[in-house]
Amino acid sequence: MSKRKICIVSATRAEWYLLRNLCHEIQNDKDLSLQIIATGAHLSPEFGLTYKEIEKEFKITKKIPILLANDDKISLCKSMSLAFSAFSDAFEDLKPDMVVILGDRYEMLSVASVCLLMHIPLVHLCGGELTLGAIDDSIRHSISKMSHLHFVSHEIYKKRLLQLGEEEKRVFNIGSLASTIIKNMNFLNKKDLEKALEMKLDKELYLITYHPLTLNVKNTQKEIKTLLKKLDTLKNASLIFTKANADENGLLINEILQNYCQKNSHKAKLFDNLGSQKYLSLMKIAKAMIGNSSSGISESPFFKTPCINIGDRQKGRLRTQNIIDSEINDLDQAFEKLESKEFKQNLKNFKNPYDNGKNPNKIIKTCLKNVNLDTILHKNFIDL
């Protein structure tokens, strides 16, 4: 019997970090054949050519460049158009039995649309979540409706997919994909981090990731400058920045951060891509995470590291007690709360809702192996 071909598509470093262990599970199974397509920011020098991280462990089946030089609305639309055409050709060539994508990126909306029209079963990871301050929210729900199997990180997100009419037999709550990564991570100590980053970490460490405001792009420059102004007031601080993603105004944010770090090289450094080991090791020892990244919401709870979450970009996602939500103009109050006795006490006792003790990648792989492909495309809509 021929092996079932599973095609994993990844466009960003954040996606790959969560998909990597699943790829190992698939590759090590005698009944499955792994295909990997790298696209989007993975192939961009601006974002660190992160496809090279994939190639350290896997053979990339196809590389599909779709990013244009600019990141305005028109360029993003044209990138989606390029993706639609290129993935049509890729899937016609590879003939995958199933395609697996993660999350809510605009690139994946093109991939999902191609799968729909080509009658390829689509598996969606991390659906059912909310990010009401970003266009990602609409993209995520749209992808879910075009998908045939769903693997979510919490029961709340499972219920939301059922609200969208999905059949319960197609939706699996597997907990956070980050859980096994973090539990099995060989963390770097501070000395090893200093060597790897070429930076002294003898001050209070802040890990900062700030992405574009896709529903409020006009305020992006103002908000990032307001954040940097606040960071300038921190005494005895080491500031580690990671680059913004490939959304509209991502390049603008990265240029501002680059200039800031050059002027403040004694305390600040910007990285294209830290990689999961360095990133999680920094998260573990940081005084706080700052920004509007989903990792601050869903991964910092594993370490009980405080996270100052700025603005509405992650609005709607499940919160834990280590999260301090703040508007950009209320950062003084957020840092006051960070130092409060009550907040520090709460950090000791909260339960992480993203860790349910399961091995998510084994669950996904088992479903990919055993699902009936003859009937999977025929979906029902379940009314509440």
Curated annotation (Swiss-Prot):
GO biological process, one term: carbohydrate biosynthetic process
EC number: 3.2.1.184
InterPro entries: UDP-GlcNAc_Epase, UDP_GlcNAc_Epimerase_2_dom, WecB-like
Keywords of this entry: Bacterial flagellum biogenesis, Hydrolase
Gene Ontology MF, one: GDP-2,4-diacetamido-2,4,6-trideoxy-alpha-D-glucopyranose hydrolase/2-epimerase activity
Keyword Hydrolase: yes
CDD domains per record: GTB_UDP-GlcNAc_2-Epimerase
Reaction catalyzed: GDP-N,N'-diacetylbacillosamine + H2O = 2,4-diacetamido-2,4,6-trideoxy-alpha-D-mannopyranose + GDP + H(+); UDP-N,N'-diacetylbacillosamine + H2O = 2,4-diacetamido-2,4,6-trideoxy-alpha-D-mannopyranose + UDP + H(+)
Function as written in the Swiss-Prot or TrEMBL entry: Involved in biosynthesis of legionaminic acid (5,7-diamino-3,5,7,9-tetradeoxy-D-glycero-D-galacto-non-2-ulosonic acid)(Leg), a sialic acid-like derivative that is incorporated into flagellin via O-linkage to Ser/Thr. Catalyzes the conversion of GDP-N,N'-diacetylbacillosamine (Bac2Ac4Ac) into 2,4-diacetamido-2,4,6-trideoxymannose and GDP. It can also use UDP-N,N'-diacetylbacillosamine however it generates small quantities of 2,4-diacetamido-2,4,6-trideoxymannose.
Family listed: Belongs to the UDP-N-acetylglucosamine 2-epimerase family.
Protein's name in the database: GDP/UDP-N,N'-diacetylbacillosamine 2-epimerase (hydrolyzing)
